[in-house]
């Protein structure tokens, strides 16, 4: 009942050296790369999201949830077993085929990039996405967040984590060099590594605002060492709706330098998102 496949518009005019999932050739190369990556990890049925599950359930009230970048869909299964109407999307096809073929068959999860989420608008009151956005090319970030906004209900919450460093598969030393040699596609694994303030500016431009209380709750319940460890730069607790206070401003934890924890922002985020919305309207009417 939630599924509504959107009209797909493919942009084939991609600048040289600028990879994007909306380019059909690049899309197939990315899917191949991540399937090969899954094989390198011996098809491990891991759940990166599960460490956050208790914190999410304690903090947020939700009946419907989308896990964007659900991997092998372990968290989706756990949530459904607890009565939540949880769904998932995953750009790589192999993890779902190996570990979630039943969920693929019944339309609970889909193998699709975040730019083309096959669910109706305003379907979910909770969004999760753990260690996914750094894998998305920068040219596709705004389209991805725009799709999350489309399927999220007004007032929905989101918990998103974004990697803040170069992937070990983007280096070439020792064991890593051997692993990289087995991957035929030479795109980066971590395409978009940006400072915390850049992400806050980007989310805010799309109407997602930081919830500092929820963020600290997640740090306390899900960060190894809890509040005794520095708050992670790449964790974001967000609410879709009207801003409260200064939700786009990065708050620096005690003992940390703003240049390290927050970094440089994205001053043109609102302008870039406004252009995207204009382009999407043109595509829809074409």
At which residue positions do the language-model features occur?
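A structural motif corresponding to the C-terminal end of an alpha-helix
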Residues: 202, 206-209
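Conserved N-terminal segment of class I S-adenosyl-L-methionine
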Residues: 1-120, 126-130, 139-145, 174-178, ...
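Short beta-strand-to-coil "C-cap" segments at the C-terminal boundary of structured domains/repeats
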Residues: 238-243
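A short acidic, helix-capping loop that chelates divalent metal ions and anchors anionic groups
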Residues: 168-170, 182-183
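A short His-aromatic
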Residues: 135-136
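Conserved beta-strand signature within the Rossmann-like core of class I S-adenosyl-L-methionine
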Residues: 155-163
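A short glycine-rich, Lys/Arg-flanked "PGG" loop and its adjoining helix->strand segment in the class I
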Residues: 142-156
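Active-site-proximal loop/turn and secondary-structure-junction residues that shape catalytic pockets
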Residues: 132, 164
